[in-house]
Amino acid sequence: MKVLSLIFVLFSVLVLFASAKDPVCDQPKAVGRCFAAFPKFYFNSSSGQCEAFIYGGCGGNENNFNTLEECNAKCA
């Protein structure tokens, strides 16, 4: 019975860690302070989806992905 309880606890911990979202995904959209126009994607924590935006090319934050697939893999 103790072994079964231990297995259950370990499984629960693994599920919690696997479902933990990367803190990058909670950062706001940041277009940057320059004036280029690069199409990028960010995770919108309000809508729970990755969305397109135009990145200025410098500054910003880590919630900035080159492809929709990359954004979804990290955050969705």
Curated annotation (Swiss-Prot):
InterPro entries: Kunitz_BPTI, Kunitz_BPTI_sf, Prtase_inh_Kunz-CS, TFPI/VKTCI-like
Signal sequence extent: 1-20
Keyword Cytoplasm attributed: no
Gene3D superfamilies: Pancreatic trypsin inhibitor Kunitz domain
Name of this chain's protein: Tabkunin 1
UniProt cross-references to SUPFAM superfamilies, sorted A to Z: BPTI-like
PANTHER family assigned: KUNITZ-TYPE PROTEASE INHIBITOR-RELATED, SERINE PEPTIDASE INHIBITOR, KUNITZ TYPE, 3
PROSITE patterns cross-referenced by the UniProt entry: BPTI_KUNITZ_1 (PS00280), BPTI_KUNITZ_2 (PS50279)
GO cellular component labels: extracellular space
